[in-house]
């Protein structure tokens, strides 16, 4: 069943519409809505941060239903796809019975969201050969800067031996940008122009722990560049461990994100990185794309500063924000 708020005809007794609502009445309705939402937010924060403070009160079924509809609206306002909201709320329907507290309902929604996101899948270094990490994605999402942030962590924080390869020869600025980062980190950089050059470039860095490969950003509508990217990924020798990270912007429209994901559907086992979280207040697309692609989210970025403005995806933090928690 859908948990979307019912229409007025379904939820309210018919009453004559006033010719002109009084300002005081309108203000009262708004204030009441604010109070309800604030009450929900406070209870959410209490549930997340202090789950054992006190025994929760037992609501009536009407309160439960209203609470679920507020949860529905909160997720919808965060741009979670309606079909995913209904799937989650369908699963917790069994908890909507007398005697269950609002905390129980909220806790189950919270857990369902946590399970759907799963755990972050970050870059692992565990072999004798270098791990070759490809970063792919559309133009303008901050792919090269993201590479620099992660590479800086491996070099400075984890004391790993790293190298750069760029196959992004469509944009001179991208190569220059990565070369600047390579110079700052005192890290070697190779530029390749075709997929056939990849293995010889990787072989030059046999002593590296991680080799970061920057690829050309392109429109998902550009079939030629898509084929070039596929050839590059397929061209790596199987003796090397490979990881692929699809970099997406959290500010991109949902419909466009779906088209981008569809254009990468023939790539096996890629992970997701979302950039520009600082430029949006709605995080629903992170859940939407995770569920649509079935790819794990690894990192998120929240600014331009290298290497600071990146972190491993924090599932609990994002879920709290999706449920109306304060950032």
Q: Where is each model-derived feature located?
A:
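Walker A (P-loop) phosphate-binding loop of P-loop NTPases
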Residues: 140
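Non-catalytic terminal/linker segments enriched in charged/polar, low-complexity residues
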Residues: 1-116, 121
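Conserved lysine of the Walker
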Residues: 143
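Phosphate-binding P-loop
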Residues: 123-130
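Short beta-strand-centered segment that lines the nucleotide-binding/catalytic pocket of NTP-utilizing
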Residues: 157-173, 191-196, 301-302
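Hydrophobic positions on the alpha1 helix immediately C-terminal to the Walker A/P-loop
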Residues: 146, 150, 177
């Amino acid at each position: 069943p859908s948990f979307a708020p019912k229409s007025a005809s379904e939820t309210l007794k018919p009453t004559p519409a006033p010719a002109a609502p009084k300002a005081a009445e309108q203000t009262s309705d708004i204030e009441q809505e604010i109070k309800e939402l604030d009450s929900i937010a406070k209870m959410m924060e209490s549930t997340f941060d202090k789950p054992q403070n006190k025994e929760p009160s037992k609501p009536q079924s009407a309160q439960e239903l209203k609470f679920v509809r507020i949860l529905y609206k909160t997720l919808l306002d965060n741009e979670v796809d309606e079909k995913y909201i209904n799937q989650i709320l369908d699963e917790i329907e069994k908890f909507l019975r007398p005697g269950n507290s609002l905390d129980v309902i909220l806790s189950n929604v919270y857990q369902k969201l946590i399970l759907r996101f799963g755990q972050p899948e970050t870059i692992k270094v565990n072999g004798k050969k270098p791990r070759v990490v490809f970063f792919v994605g559309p133009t303008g999402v901050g792919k090269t800067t993201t590479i620099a942030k992660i590479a800086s962590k491996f070099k400075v924080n984890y004391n790993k031996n790293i190298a750069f390869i760029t196959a992004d020869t469509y944009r001179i600025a991208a190569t220059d940008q990565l070369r600047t980062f390579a110079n700052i980190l005192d890290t070697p950089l190779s530029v390749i122009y075709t997929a056939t050059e990849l293995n010889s470039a990787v072989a030059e860095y046999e002593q590296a722990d991680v080799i970061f490969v920057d690829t050309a950003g392109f429109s998902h509508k550009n079939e030629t560049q898509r084929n070039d990217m596929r050839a590059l990924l397929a061209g790596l020798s199987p003796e090397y461990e490979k990881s692929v990270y699809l970099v997406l912007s959290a500010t991109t429209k949902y419909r466009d994100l779906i088209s981008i994901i569809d254009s990468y559907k023939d790539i096996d086992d890629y992970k997701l990185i979302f950039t520009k979280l600082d430029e949006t207040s709605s995080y629903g697309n992170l859940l939407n794309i995770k569920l649509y692609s079935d790819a794990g989210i690894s990192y998120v970025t929240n600014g331009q500063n290298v290497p600071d403005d990146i972190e491993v995806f924090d599932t609990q933090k994002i879920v709290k924000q999706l449920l109306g928690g304060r950032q």
